């Protein structure tokens, strides 16, 4: 019998949800998606250090030796996203999704400018627009930015989508693709209700995507639907037939090792009759979002989470730049890392505030008092810097 992955691939485009190039090679998906958290995770893999260094060198060369560390790091962040994207496109035959800085989620003009910059970097590398999706958070401002970008020939993937109003607004804006977050919807309902689990068809995330799918197909919207953020195989099985599903390497591995019959659950040709068609403007969008506490809270949480991942990556890039440049930017790096981790601004970092691993915290905590002062970070990273530049 064929595996679940083999059967799923005949009815749904399977997309790898990872920045790990080896995982993408293993599963040979058509497309791949990345986000700040995935890029941050991939940046920890030693094999990819050369890609990080390439971006830092390129950004320093572009901006010049007099440019401040934060300028170089900010430029390198765009370079890194595109460098990983270019490597992914050497493996997958289809598209890669590259995300706009989540901190721009409520700024339409800044989002448009960043998208043009990212697609320009791809174009400079000889990659055409049809192979790239620019990921933008599904705020009203983000959706309006995507509407402009689509008219400019830049295709968009609207992410952090949790509510029906977001989906309808995206479809009416003519965006290429949306990514409703199945698992994060489930997370909210489990936390809100205290219920430990939901059977596949009862899963709130599955219900949400199914509703969006049938609505889009009933009213002939061209926007593709890519279910994302899965927590278990049942969610994937219940959405077999969706346009696309972006799946983590762990779940791809389970699908590829499980032999069982798989039934199509969603049918674009014969959708289940949807509710009456609606139209969404800014006022109705905001009203519907306020009324949907889950969507409102998860969108806010998602933007904050992706923003924090970017800030963490920037701090790591600043540290790496200091290593590459022989410590010239070291004091700035220490300050940036300290400010990022000192969440309550009281001048010390506790283990609970520390964003890194326990092993690193323990190494920096010389007096073992469970608190890091700026001098602890400076002396600890200084020793590491001396070793890496020796």
From Swiss-Prot:
Active site residues per record: 135
GO-annotated molecular function: calcium ion binding; transaldolase activity
EC numbers for this chain: 2.2.1.2
UniProt GO cellular component terms: cytoplasm
Pathway where this protein functions: Carbohydrate degradation; pentose phosphate pathway; D-glyceraldehyde 3-phosphate and beta-D-fructose 6-phosphate from D-ribose 5-phosphate and D-xylulose 5-phosphate (non-oxidative stage): step 2/3
Domain EF-hand: 329-364, 365-388
Compartments in which it is found: Cytoplasm
Alphabetically ordered keywords of this record: Calcium, Cytoplasm, Metal-binding, Pentose shunt, Repeat, Schiff base, Transferase
Residues bound to Ca(2+) 2: 365, 367, 369, 371, 376
InterPro entries: Aldolase_TIM, EF-hand-dom_pair, EF_Hand_1_Ca_BS, EF_hand_dom, TAL/FSA, Transaldolase_1, Transaldolase_AS
Any GO BP: carbohydrate metabolic process
NCBIfam families: PRK12309.1 (NF008965), talAB (TIGR00874)
HAMAP family in UniProt: Transaldolase_1 (MF_00492)
Family membership: Belongs to the transaldolase family. Type 1 subfamily.
Functional note: Transaldolase is important for the balance of metabolites in the pentose-phosphate pathway.
PANTHER family xref list: TRANSALDOLASE (PTHR10683:SF18)
Stated name of the protein: Transaldolase
Species for this entry: Prochlorococcus marinus (strain MIT 9313)
Gene name as annotated: tal
